[in-house]
């Protein structure tokens, strides 16, 4: 398995189904999609072309679902896609073309209500704008006690020696969704 894509899920069915429309056609025998349902017990997820793990209780953040995904991931590389975000039709293709370094930085744009916004910042600490060689993650996991900035803290402990970037914007970060962890 070359790539595992991990999606933490919490009450975002409409967004997740839209993401599935883009992601499922890109999945191959070398690419797995892992959705970790954080206490919602959303049965509609079971119809997707993904390994779905239903956690019994809501953890209140993305850390625990991401850790569960990391624990079951079979890919040599790990990508994270948030359930309310969107990707381009060639996301997987572009990622697979670049699997040769410890970290692959992904170019991205913000979107509000499906409208793509201006130029992204030069640097972002989020895990969704990186693809990680699983071997450099090793036993590093997200801290369950952090509800904000867990991405930044995780990335401080991952020590890549080599990296590359994908110049074309293949990831769209959803800003301003009510109920989002980043919106409070």
Regions found by a protein language model. Name each.
Residues 78:
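Short aromatic/hydrophobic "clamp" motif used to bind/position activated sugar donors
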Residues 15-17, 40-49, 86, 90:
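Acidic helix N-cap motif at the loop->helix transition within catalytic regions
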Residues 2-4, 22, 32, 153:
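Cell-envelope/extracellular polymer assembly enzymes that use nucleotide-activated donors
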Residues 56-73:
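Glycine-rich, basic loop-to-helix element that forms the pyrophosphate-binding segment
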Residues 117-184:
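Conserved nucleotide-sugar donor-binding catalytic segment
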Residues 86, 90-116:
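Conserved donor NDP-sugar-binding/catalytic core segment of glycosyltransferases
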Residues 12-25:
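Short, well-formed alpha-helical segments that are part of the catalytic scaffolds
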Residues 35-46, 59, 82:
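A conserved acidic beta->alpha catalytic loop
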């Amino acid at each position: 398995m070359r790539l595992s894509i991990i999606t933490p899920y919490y009450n975002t069915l409409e967004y997740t189904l839209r993401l599935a429309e883009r992601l499922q056609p890109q999945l191959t025998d070398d690419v797995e999609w892992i959705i970790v349902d954080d206490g919602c017990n959303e049965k509609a997820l079971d119809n997707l072309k993904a390994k779905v793990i239903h956690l019994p209780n809501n953890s209140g953040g993305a850390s625990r679902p991401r850790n569960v995904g990391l624990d079951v991931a079979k890919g040599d590389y790990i990508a994270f896609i948030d359930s309310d975000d969107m990707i381009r039709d060639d996301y997987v293709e572009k990622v697979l073309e670049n699997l040769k370094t410890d970290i692959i930085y992904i170019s991205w744009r913000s979107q509000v209500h499906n409208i793509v916004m201006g130029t992204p910042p030069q640097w972002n600490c989020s895990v969704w704008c990186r693809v990680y060689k699983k071997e450099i993650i090793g036993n590093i996991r997200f801290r369950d006690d952090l509800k904000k900035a867990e991405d930044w803290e995780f990335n401080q402990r991952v020590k890549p020696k080599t990296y590359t970037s994908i110049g074309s914007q293949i990831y769209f970060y959803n800003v301003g969704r009510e109920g989002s962890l980043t919106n409070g």
